[in-house]
A protein has these predicted regions:
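Short, surface-exposed connector motifs at secondary-structure boundaries
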Residues: 123-125
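Flexible, glycine/charged-enriched surface loops at secondary-structure junctions
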Residues: 42-49, 64-66
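N-terminal and secondary-structure boundary signal
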Residues: 38-41, 56-63
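Generic N-terminal amphipathic, Lys/Arg-enriched alpha-helix
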Residues: 21-40
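Short, Lys/Arg-enriched N-terminal segments with co-localized hydrophobic residues
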Residues: 6-20
Length: 125
């Protein structure tokens, strides 16, 4: 996805550095996230998009929106709050705007779709 950062450092969960910081390759983190999501039944394309967003968000230091959320997403998937089989639908498509019904898909799926649509529209309007 963003492809700018190769690795990031993860602080211990107690928040105290103490010189003990782990360095994880972004590719390994993406693979882990994708595998977890696929084991829950998410199709490869969507699992890859979600893994890319979560991992690279961590790499840029925005941990509040990164991989720390994966366990919560898994809980919501298992509880039925997130539909891993949902196919977001474009319900309004005009020259310079579009509206997507995410249909309870995990947020990164319609977000990536919306970004692609916005880029296409920007190139044609």
């Amino acid at each position: 996805m963003l492809g700018v950062v190769d690795s990031f450092q993860m602080h211990p969960s107690n928040g105290q550095d103490g010189g003990n910081m782990s360095k994880i390759a972004i590719s390994d983190l993406k693979d882990f996230c994708r595998t977890v999501l696929q084991k829950e039944g998410m199709k490869n394309e969507y699992a890859t998009n979600v893994a890319d967003v979560l991992s690279e968000t961590d790499a840029f230091g925005i941990h509040s929106h990164g991989t720390k959320n994966l366990p919560g997403y898994i809980q919501k998937i298992r509880a039925g709050g997130i539909d891993i089989h949902a196919e977001p639908e474009i319900i309004l498509n005009a020259a310079s705007l579009a509206t997507i019904d995410a249909r309870r898909a995990i947020g990164m799926v319609p977000a990536v779709q919306a970004m692609d649509i916005a880029c296409q529209k920007a190139n044609h309007t």
